[in-house]
């Protein structure tokens, strides 16, 4: 139905929050100290920054809108190795996104997101536990174009949103060689996100044909099982070795799987009807690669790439960053 493109705001907001927690997870999973050594003068402090780009697409199904979202942004974070077992920290992220959608109408706009991330990792012998809490807020703009006969009209909207997510991951270390330089980690991951895009009224040449859009709220949980394979590769002149990583997961969603909004014409905003976005597949195959290369005695340059593939939807993202050990 005309107007279904407004649902792209809510579902893209949710997907962006889930991507964000995945990026933080990739960093936190590599934190902590090497248990093979004696560590004195703790705590140890670290700071890192990274730039990230992503592309996500949800296929349109008839009059049920999908979306395409391209984002770019960055994260600054700090973490502390409090003792041999426990690491904690925080990070701030700003992402800027370009959003398009097509169904019975077409739409384009911006979806900018800002996140505060708190995280902790605990290592006990071969078991590791990881917890991430992320809160976010959003600024969004969307311009819809509706064609009729030989003409068209445009309707402009702007709004804000917020969201919260939590993620827990459990992993077990299996050494694949005698010096433990190659580690296989079977893992279990559970997460939940809840988002809200505030309602708004459109303006522009649409006049009374513009829409009053009510709040869009989504809550989705996911459980995943998979494995992470990491290994040391080469070393620099200071004896510090590079770390390579491959990740694969199968993830299952529960809860909301499509965007939905109640809308009414400005001519009679008391009468509303629901419009729906395309439904996304609940089972995903997720894969990622990472490489951390030491620089000097205290720095590390890292790169990451990730993909999420499921029925009707796919996304890819990559990041590059620098980490400094004080």
Residue ranges, per PLM feature:
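Interface/linker segment at the passenger-translocator junction
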Residues: 1-59
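Membrane translocator/pore-forming domains, dominated by Gram-negative outer-membrane beta-barrels
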Residues: 1-3, 42-326
């Amino acid at each position: 139905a005309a107007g279904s493109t407004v649902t792209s705001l809510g579902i893209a907001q949710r997907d962006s929050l889930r991507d964000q927690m995945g990026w933080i997870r990739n960093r936190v999973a590599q934190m902590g100290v090497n248990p093979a050594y004696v560590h004195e003068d703790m705590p140890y402090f670290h700071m890192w920054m990274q730039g990230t780009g992503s592309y996500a697409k949800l296929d349109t199904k008839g009059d049920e809108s999908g979306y395409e979202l391209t984002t770019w942004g960055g994260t600054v974070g700090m973490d502390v190795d409090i003792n041999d077992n426990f690491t904690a920290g925080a990070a701030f992220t700003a992402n800027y996104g370009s959003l398009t959608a097509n169904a019975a109408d077409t739409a384009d706009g911006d979806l900018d997101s800002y996140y505060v991330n708190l995280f902790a990792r605990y290592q006990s012998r071969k078991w590791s536990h990881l917890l991430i809490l992320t809160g976010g807020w959003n600024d969004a703009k969307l311009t819809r174009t509706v064609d009729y006969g030989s003409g068209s009209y445009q309707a402009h909207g702007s709004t804000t949103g917020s969201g919260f997510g939590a993620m827990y991951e459990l992993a077990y270390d299996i050494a694949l060689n005698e010096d433990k330089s190659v580690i296989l980690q079977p893992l279990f991951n559970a997460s939940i996100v809840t988002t809200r895009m505030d309602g708004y009224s459109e303006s522009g040449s649409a006049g009374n044909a513009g829409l009053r859009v009510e709040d869009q709220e989504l809550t989705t949980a996911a459980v995943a099982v998979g494995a992470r394979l990491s290994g040391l590769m080469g070393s620099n002149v200071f004896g510090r070795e590079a770390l390579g990583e491959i990740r694969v997961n199968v993830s299952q969603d529960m809860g909301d799987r499509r965007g939905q909004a109640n809308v009414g014409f400005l001519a009679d905003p008391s009468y509303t009807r629901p419009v729906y976005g395309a439904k996304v597949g609940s089972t995903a195959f997720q894969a990622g690669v990472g490489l951390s290369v030491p620089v000097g005695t205290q720095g590390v340059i890292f790169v990451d790439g990730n993909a999420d593939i499921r029925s009707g939807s796919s996304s890819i993202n990559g990041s590059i960053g620098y980490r400094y050990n004080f």
